[in-house]
Design a protein with these regions (language model features):
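Fe(II)/2-oxoglutarate oxygenase catalytic core
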Residues: 2-267
Length: 267
């Protein structure tokens, strides 16, 4: 993990320098675009190096966001909580969720997440892309994305292992939304006021970092220590929406490959 983290930080710094030297200092150039996938020139902002947490400005295009909401319309059900390969409904998570059919647009988003993590991460390590919808009063209490159950390692080793990394992107939100931020209580709040576009700078300093639900943007973080154990510092919560609604997107990368019975087919 440590060499991967160093390589990722070096790649981000190099890409940013190249973008600035080309005369376009406002946006990071995409690493790769193909005839099928035109990746946006999103910007990267490193919030924390340990644990690694990176903010991605403009990670999703308006067209992708509209497509995601359209193809998942009327498919949301009450969100389950998974740990150690089992799922259940709990009061700690009151949102609704749905898996997104892996069509061409979704495969492009998957490709973007893989390119961001380096060329050596196979597509089969990705869980199905998930959307989550939060209405007024709905929330997800403090949790980690990595499986905390001590017996989970044996059960999940045959199904991809633990969650290596996470993306959480903001797909849509109502104009009147209040609340609904993503809070990391163990992260140190940055001092630079430019972060106030993306985080709630009115929060008390001892509340950690709360990312605002800014549509199109995303947060990336690593879930595990170099030895493969879970990093408790990335504990986070989906704070209650006090008015309006929001839709977010989860992209989880596992340690190993997942079978088609879990990932599902291309459509």
């Amino acid at each position: 993990m440590a060499p991967f983290r160093d390589l990722l930080l070096f790649a981000i710094a190099t890409a940013t320098c190249l973008a600035q030297s080309s005369g376009d200092g406002d946006a990071q150039k995409p690493l790769v675009s193909t005839d099928e996938c035109k990746h946006p020139a999103y910007q990267t902002h490193i919030l924390s190096k340990s644990p690694l947490v990176i903010y991605l400005e403009g990670f999703l295009t308006p067209e992708e966001r509209a497509h995601l909401t359209e193809v998942t319309k009327d498919t949301f059900t009450h969100s389950a909580v998974a740990d150690g390969g089992s799922e259940g409904l709990r009061k700690t998570r009151t949102s609704q969720s749905t898996n997104v059919p892996r069509d061409a647009a979704v495969r492009c988003i998957e490709e973007r997440s893989l390119l961001f993590q380096g060329f050596d991460v196979p597509r089969t390590h990705l869980e199905p892309v998930q959307l989550v919808k939060y209405g007024q009063g709905e929330h997800y209490h403090f949790h980690t994305d990595w499986y905390t159950d001590a017996a989970a390692h044996a059960r999940t080793s045959a199904t991809g292992g633990n969650r290596l990394s996470s993306f959480f992107a903001y797909v849509a939100a109502s104009d009147d939304i209040t609340g609904g931020g993503t809070n990391f209580p163990m992260l140190e709040a940055p001092l630079d006021e430019r972060w106030c576009k993306f985080i709630d700078c009115d929060e008390p300093w001892d509340r950690g970092v709360t990312f605002r639900p800014v549509v199109g943007n995303a947060v990336y973080w690593e879930n595990l220590h170099p030895d493969g154990t879970g990093d408790e510092r990335n504990l986070h919560a989906g704070l209650p929406v006090t008015s309006g609604w929001k839709i977010g997107m989860n992209i989880w990368t596992r340690q190993g490959p997942l079978g088609e019975d879990i990932r599902g087919p291309d459509v």
